[in-house]
């Protein structure tokens, strides 16, 4: 509530499509406040329409790419992707697969920079991921060809903004930020927790 006066001062959107991607175990409802805010600022806000995010899966990745391409072609405008936590990994993947359709990539506390040695996330996060998504935990995705491509070609040819917090508690700051060319990539430190 204390941030509403500051948020009200932000510039209005130009009506271009913005696709919101939920974090691990989140669904469209988990981003309802963000959807309401961005819609009120003049953006054409869409949700991913794939239900609960239960991990980085091929069917979701393919459906996301199709949705990005459909939004781009149906509106005639490039799409901004906003992904929270694991949703940011999906957004990064979508931007790499369809850069000609993406205007801007925004990640919110997303593990977009996990090295081949695996995530430094807390043990609790890893246990939860093992229980829901895959028994090997988040490290299983580091070995997959799709994620290997993310590591090798981390930066899509679109502007990218990574929001991170030193007090995130789930995704370490070094995994939520990227090094890239100035003017195309920015890391923005914010105050707050992961949720």
List each model region and its residues:
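Short, flexible, glycine/charge-rich loop motifs used to bind or transfer phosphoryl groups or to couple energy/partner
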Residues: 6-9, 95-96, 148-153, 176-178
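Serine-dependent carboxylesterase/thioesterase catalytic core
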Residues: 16-22, 27-29, 33, 39-52, ...
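A broad structural signal for short, well-ordered beta-strand segments within beta-sheet-rich domains
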Residues: 14, 102, 182-184
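C-terminal catalytic-base region of ester-bond hydrolases, centering on the histidine
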Residues: 156-195
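Alpha/beta-hydrolase fold catalytic core
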Residues: 1-16
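Flexible, charged surface loops at secondary-structure boundaries
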Residues: 11-13, 154-157
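Short hydrophobic/aromatic-rich motifs at helix boundaries and adjacent loops
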Residues: 5-8, 37-41, 181-182
């Amino acid at each position: 509530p204390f941030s509403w006066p500051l948020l009200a001062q932000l510039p209005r959107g130009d009506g271009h499509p913005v696709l919101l991607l939920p974090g691990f175990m989140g669904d469209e409802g988990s981003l309802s406040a963000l959807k309401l805010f961005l819609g009120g600022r003049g953006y054409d806000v869409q949700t991913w329409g794939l239900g609960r995010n239960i991990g980085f899966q091929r069917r979701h990745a393919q459906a996301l790419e199709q949705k990005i391409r459909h939004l781009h072609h149906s509106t005639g405008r490039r799409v901004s992707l906003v992904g929270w936590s694991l949703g940011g990994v999906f957004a990064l993947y979508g931007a790499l697969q369809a850069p000609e359709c993406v205007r801007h990539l925004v990640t919110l506390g997303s593990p977009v920079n996990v090295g081949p040695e695996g995530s430094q996330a807390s043990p609790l996060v890893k246990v939860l991921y093992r229980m829901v998504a895959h028994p090997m935990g988040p490290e299983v995705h580091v070995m997959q060809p799709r994620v290997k491509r993310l590591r090798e070609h981390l930066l899509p040819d679109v502007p990218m903004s990574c929001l991170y917090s030193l007090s995130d508690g789930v995704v370490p700051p070094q995994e939520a930020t990227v090094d890239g060319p100035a003017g195309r990539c920015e890391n923005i430190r914010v105050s707050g927790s992961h949720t």
